[in-house]
């Protein structure tokens, strides 16, 4: 999360229009689920974190980040708040649950509705992940289309990445993580568009 990437090239940036704000996601995820595992360790999910993300964008603007054991991020000096893309779910974070569980499937519906209101009414650019607008029930898992030996390397790398989370550290759970190269992993991640008609209450929100 480097704020300077939003600056024009003559100021050392890449002239980007917007950037993910993982800090908002992480703070919200901890607030909703109470989970502070893996790279969520440095977040408390308190109201002040969420307010700071709405006011300033990145929470980490050069402070020490315990999980990475080094400073994280840089300031967003002079950048408009809408340059931060805020989200409760995206392809990375849903897939990083290992089994591809969507946030609304394991947190309080009341809290999830409140978090959605904060997301949509905040000054940043909100992102709704595929199917989030109608509470899609399908999982979204990490998938890739590689030939051997890269396919096995990616699968093993995925297991190693997930070991940072205590809930995925056991061998039994590791074995349950879907193979990214299996076509079924991709197919199970596709939306059931009929849910738009079945979940009309979610669309009304």
PLM regions: where:
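Aromatic- and carboxylate-lined catalytic core of secreted/periplasmic carbohydrate-active enzymes
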Residues: 176-205
């Amino acid at each position: 999360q480097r704020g300077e990437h939003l600056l024009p090239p003559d100021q050392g940036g890449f002239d980007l229009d917007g950037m993910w704000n993982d800090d908002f996601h992480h703070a919200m995820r901890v607030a909703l689920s109470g989970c502070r595992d893996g790279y969520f360790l440095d977040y408390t999910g308190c109201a002040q974190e969420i307010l700071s993300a709405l006011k300033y964008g990145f929470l980490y603007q050069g402070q020490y980040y315990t999980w990475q054991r080094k400073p994280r991020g840089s300031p967003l000096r002079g950048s408009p708040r809408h340059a931060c893309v805020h989200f409760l779910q995206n392809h990375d974070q849903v897939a990083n649950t290992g089994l591809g569980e969507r946030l609304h499937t394991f947190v309080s519906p009341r809290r999830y509705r409140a978090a959605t209101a904060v997301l949509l009414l905040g000054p940043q650019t909100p992102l709704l992940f595929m199917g989030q607008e109608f509470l899609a029930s399908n999982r979204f898992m990490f998938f890739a289309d590689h030939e051997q030996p890269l396919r096995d390397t990616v699968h093993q790398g995925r297991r190693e990445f997930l070991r940072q989370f205590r809930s995925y550290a056991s061998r039994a759970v590791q074995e349950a993580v879907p193979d990214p190269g299996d076509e079924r992993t991709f197919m199970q991640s596709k939306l059931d568009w009929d849910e738009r008609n079945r979940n009309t209450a979610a669309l009304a929100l």
